[in-house]
Amino acid sequence: MRKIKSENQILIMLAFFSVSMGLWENFRQLWLQDNGFSATNISNIISIGTLISVVGIMFVGKHIKLSKLKTFVSCSLIIKFLNLIFILYLNNRGNMNLINISIIIDVLTGYLVTTSIYPLITTIIKNNTIYSKRKLTEYLFKDVGILVGGLLIGRSVIGILVNYNVCLFISIVFLAISILVMFNMSACKNIENKQGENVSIIKYILKSKLQVIYMIYSFIGAMAMSTALGLKMLTLTNYFKFSDNQATNYLLIVGLAADIIGILALKYLTPKNDYITITIKFGIRFIAYVIAFLSNNIIITLIAMTWSILISTSYENICDGYYVNEIDNKYQLTFTNFRYVIRYLGEATGIFLCGVMYEIGLRYMFGLSAFFLIFQIGLAYYLIYLRKKERYIQ
């Protein structure tokens, strides 16, 4: 039997983990709503969970060595598994405080695992293609999780009505499989500690103007995306009047289409001019958001939302891959964690703003996001300019 490559073993674990995440996260907002949480409550608790995740990621970057990363990921998976079982138990029991704590732990462990995957892979192989494969694996199998939920929600299976809590149970099963794959993984067992000693990642980044601008770009980009789409399921079910099944099917179809577009873009549809690539990814999104805001039309807003999701997985190699892979391997874990810290700070801010705008009106979610996109696009163009300038000097 042909031996599975080490990096592919990690991707297989990520696939099962992503199915679990996609299935549960798709219904988590509605599960919370069913348990008495308002949209503002939901955005606040997810924002708090994301901010606490930032602290956790900083701890990992400072104290967890590459040689111990596999063990850390395994422990995080187990904690997430036990916590989800507890959330399953808390359903409709009215204990809001315990639910708050459990959701924070759920968000925290999910982010800790997600941020640790690529540093594991870079100990084996590092290039723009494997970076995109890692991202596409996560996106694709999250959509598989959404598919599972969409096929089952509201149906009776062996006499059991599939509701949000049953979907949570199925999510736990996929998470258990990812844990088994992790325990049987031969990859990363004999990693030498390549992490630089006493590394100050902030000082390291500050030495590079390119990386400083990239961090600002990452923060604003995450904030812009989350401001418009931070509460997708609540937006679809409450503003667009989709049923939970219709909302799931919509996200599934658009998500799978986005995965296909991402794969095709990586192989065949990446323009030679990076400025054109950025314009396709973010410029059209900006125009769509502005039209949605000015028109205040529900159909136009849905089209803008759809385009944003469709293009979301495309051109990761251009928008992020270069800046990640420019970093020396011995700084990779620390840098990756710091990058996620910046990104999740932006995401937490965006989700909070999304909750505020959600209460004011749908158009304002997209209008505020369009405002942030102006800065994101400007920084993206400037990054390309700096990158080409560095290449010319070399």
Question: Where do the protein language model's features map onto the residues?
Answer:
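Hydrophobic core of transmembrane alpha-helices in multi-pass small-molecule transporters
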Residues: 15, 96-113, 219, 300-314
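C-terminal transmembrane helical hairpin of 12-TM major facilitator-type secondary transporters
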Residues: 275-316
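Helix-to-loop junctions at the C-terminal end of transmembrane segments
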Residues: 56-69, 261-274, 358
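Helix-loop boundary and gating motifs at the non-cytosolic
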Residues: 2-52, 210-252
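Central cavity-lining transmembrane alpha-helices of secondary-active solute carriers
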Residues: 44-62, 253-264
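Cytoplasmic helix-loop-helix junction between adjacent transmembrane helices
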Residues: 104-142
